């Protein structure tokens, strides 16, 4: 795969740009041409900030009949978040269940888990999920903001969005003098970083943004080396005051830590194994993602505007590992699931929308109508028929070479083609001075064509989904709104792109949600709080009438929950950000080969989560922050026999503005060195551990 020597490139570009930059320029910020840009530039977001995930109507959080969260890039990077997943799990009710098999990016939200239920977008564009895996974006350096919509969102983004939608908005070109930021960092486990952020005007009509980031580490487990490179580049041409074009290319190249988890010993976690890595010596994990987009924005007249996004996405992923570890008497570890896997995925798509300000029955109204088309190719190579196993000592770390007993060896196994087409519309109508109706409809059609490259067989299926949403927002005061909504969503019984022939026989699962809530800003904008309550029912799950019966689409799962947030600026430099969530999720009707699981809680779903972040300006030059993340106990198996313990992890940081253009920072992660598991596999007998205590020192220079 292509590599970018980003550390060398960062320095070279910085030297080239230094000649044209103005010394002492202000930090790289988006222009305040929209509310979104202003909020991001100030490093804050509030209930008056439009959310890119909650609607395409440009509504603020107060105007949206749904539970949303917005994090500016400054907030994301200012809270020790290395990944987008780290950032969004500091918002209400979302927890990480990442593992190498899902790209380290899977989430749990509102009682529903994995990439089939929690959708992740990049600047509003969806990369279809292949075999349960998403590997982009790489890090948070190029992130301008992250918007979260909780609850069903198929009416906005199509099937597969029952739990939540996360939209990552990258940094955008801006007008004005060229401004640059260089960062160098070093910390525990030989972790190092070199990064560049540059942007500004090249002429009256041309502006750009360029972000480069290279990171590497020796890792906190044996043989845990990792490295990543990320590139985000965009060029904007303002053809006129009403017409603009933006061409962008984003790329990530990763060699993540080759750690597949830690086995329990006689059903118990042994702390002495924290740094052990039982993978083979020649294990490999590599991800390469590329996204190229052309965005056109046209203000046709005062009432009508159009936007088009044409995009090409390419992904290559490769794994070669011993994936499963089981403790054996005599303190041996049996290794199995020796698999070599490659994904090659290409996606071409286009989304066209029109936004119209108009009157509807004499009432002020705004509508968005659009069409979405995607063509996705997915090919997979593997050796899943391998049954090779071996044993290694519990003391120490793995070792040995990868071996496979697949009779066909490692090679091409399947090729899939999916064509997706959708029509969608949204509307907001001001019914009275205080009451507004927000509604939406969407029709999706997907045709899936799967080719088995071993026996040359072929299977295809067409699926369709109709979804809608309706919500009322009552503005009690300009700073307080009450809302209620009803929304639906659809999901494949697994990821649509890689449904096997048996799974293709089934229809889409269906979910419906009712939600009520309130949102309020107070103390002249120095504080805000939100509260949401919801009920979700998902039907047509794969289940059995009895443990020995054949699989049918007769299962049901539900969840009820509460979510609350609080943001306060207390004066004297104190800032408080807190949230908490509670969910009661269960299988209403679910039987599998192992037994009836009705009444059980789904795996990887914590009943309670909470987050707190406190920051204090110690002086004009020094700021400090400390935060805690709490995740309740979760079940690691559908029988609810194995429990992953709850955990609380504390992080802290301090920043010192040494000079006008030089800033030093210190990040402390897992301050109290808590040992904890984020998720499990092998029926809960193998835990994926969180990283131990670490520190990281940064130096930022702006010019």
Locate predicted features.
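Outer-membrane beta-barrel translocator/receptor signature
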Residues: 129, 142-144, 155-231, 239-243, ...
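Structural signature of Gram-negative outer-membrane beta-barrels, strongest in the C-terminal barrel
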Residues: 238-240, 345, 364-366, 372-374, ...
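Gram-negative outer-membrane beta-barrel transporters
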Residues: 526, 535-537, 553-639, 672-675, ...
């Amino acid at each position: 795969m292509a590599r970018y020597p980003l550390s060398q490139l960062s320095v070279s570009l910085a030297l080239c740009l230094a000649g044209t930059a103005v010394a002492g320029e202000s930090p790289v910020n988006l222009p305040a041409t929209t509310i979104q840009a202003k909020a991001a530039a100030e490093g804050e977001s509030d209930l008056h900030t439009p959310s890119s995930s909650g609607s395409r109507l440009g509504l603020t959080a107060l105007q949206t009949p749904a539970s949303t969260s917005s994090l500016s890039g400054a907030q994301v990077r200012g809270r020790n978040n290395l990944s987008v997943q780290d950032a969004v799990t500091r918002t209400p009710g979302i927890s990480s269940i990442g593992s190498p098999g899902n790209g380290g990016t899977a989430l749990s939200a509102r009682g529903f888990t994995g990439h089939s239920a929690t959708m992740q977008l990049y600047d509003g564009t969806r990369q279809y999920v292949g075999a349960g895996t998403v590997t982009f974006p790489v890090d948070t350096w190029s992130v301008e903001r992250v918007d979260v919509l909780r609850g069903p969102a198929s009416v906005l983004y199509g099937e597969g969005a029952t739990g939540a939608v996360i939209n990552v908005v990258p940094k955008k070109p801006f007008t004005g003098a060229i401004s640059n930021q260089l960062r160098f960092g070093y910390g525990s486990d030989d972790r190092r970083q070199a990064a560049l952020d540059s942007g500004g005007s090249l002429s009256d009509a041309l502006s750009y943004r360029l972000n480069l980031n290279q990171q590497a580490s020796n890792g906190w487990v044996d043989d845990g080396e990792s490295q990543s490179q990320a590139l985000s580049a965009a060029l904007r041409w303002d053809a006129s005051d009403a017409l603009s074009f933006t061409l962008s290319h984003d790329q990530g190249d990763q060699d993540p830590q080759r750690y597949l988890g830690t086995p329990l010993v006689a059903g118990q976690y042994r702390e002495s194994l924290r740094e052990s890595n039982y993978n083979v010596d020649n294990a490999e994990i590599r991800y390469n993602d590329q996204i190229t987009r052309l965005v056109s924005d046209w203000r046709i007249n005062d009432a009508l505007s159009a936007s088009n996004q044409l995009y090409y996405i390419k992904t290559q992923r490769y794994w070669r590992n011993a994936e499963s570890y089981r403790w054996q008497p005599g303190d041996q570890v049996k290794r199995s699931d020796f698999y070599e896997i490659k994904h090659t995925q290409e996606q071409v798509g286009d989304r066209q929308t029109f936004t119209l300000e108009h009157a509807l029955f004499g009432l002020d109204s705004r509508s968005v109508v659009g069409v979405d088309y995607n063509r996705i190719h997915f090919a997979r190579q593997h050796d899943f028929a391998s049954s090779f196993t071996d044993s290694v000592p519990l003391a120490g770390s793995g070792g040995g070479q990868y071996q496979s007993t697949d009779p066909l060896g490692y090679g091409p196994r399947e090729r899939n083609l999916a064509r997706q087409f959708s029509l969608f519309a949204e509307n907001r109508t001001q019914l009275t001075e205080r009451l507004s109706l927000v509604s939406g409809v969407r029709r999706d059609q997907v045709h899936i064509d799967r080719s088995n490259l071993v026996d040359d067989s072929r299977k295809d299926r067409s699926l369709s989904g109709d979804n809608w949403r309706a919500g009322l927002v009552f503005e009690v005061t300009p700073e307080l709104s009450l809302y209620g909504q009803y929304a639906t969503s659809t999901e494949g019984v697994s990821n649509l792109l890689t449904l096997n022939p048996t799974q293709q026989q089934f229809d889409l699962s269906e979910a419906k949600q009712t939600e009520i809530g309130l949102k309020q800003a107070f103390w002249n904008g120095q504080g805000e709080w939100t509260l949401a309550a919801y009920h979700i029912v998902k039907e047509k799950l794969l289940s059995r009438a009895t443990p020995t019966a054949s699989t049918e689409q007769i299962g049901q799962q539900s969840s009820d929950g509460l979510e609350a947030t609080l943001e306060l600026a207390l004066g004297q430099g104190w800032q408080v950000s807190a949230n908490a969530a509670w969910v009661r999720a269960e299988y209403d009707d679910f039987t599998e080969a192992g037994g009836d699981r009705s009444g059980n809680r789904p795996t990887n779903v914590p009943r309670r989560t909470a987050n707190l972040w406190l920051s204090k300006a110690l002086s004009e030059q020094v700021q400090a922050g400390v935060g805690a993340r709490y995740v309740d106990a979760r079940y690691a198996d559908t029988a609810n026999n194995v429990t992953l313990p709850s955990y609380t992890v504390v992080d802290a940081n301090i920043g010192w503005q040494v000079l006008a253009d030089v800033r030093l920072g210190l990040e402390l992660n897992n301050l109290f060195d808590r040992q904890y598991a984020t998720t499990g596999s092998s029926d809960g007998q193998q835990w994926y551990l969180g990283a131990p205590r670490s520190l990281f020192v940064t130096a930022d220079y702006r010019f």
